[in-house]
Amino acid sequence: MDRLWAPWRSEYVGKESPPGCIFCAALQNNNSDEDNYVLLRTGKVFVMLNLYPYTNGHLLVVPKRHVGELTTLEKEEAFEIFQLTQKFIQTLKLAFKPEGFNIGANLGKVAGAGVPDHFHVHIVPRWQGDTNFMTAINNTRVMSEELKTTYRKLKETIKNI
């Protein structure tokens, strides 16, 4: 039997969640956007790479305000979230040439939200055949690019949008 080793997953699976909100922590550290994989900050929203992505280029669009419910977003926050979602779909198209996207939010822990108390939208680029047997049978994802490489590629590409 062949084995695929993904030791980076043990960091996610085995660690305890730090106290506080990971999004708020990333937002507070203004001097280290690259270390936190924050790609862009606007007035009410920011965009960052998912630290445990489903595919290369998996992004999170997050309101700066710590708010857990879609229904409690301010109109300006909702507008900026979807404005940046559009902008980063264009960015991902240029940088990675995906064939499609999944866009969505998991509202509540039972719905699959990893950070249920801070609303965020996922942008997941998709390619034909990217969900093969590895994900379905082995609960494993094969990532072809490191997060730092993805971050730098998107930081450069966003300048052209």
Predicted regions mapped to residue ranges:
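HIT superfamily nucleotide-processing domains
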Residues: 1-161
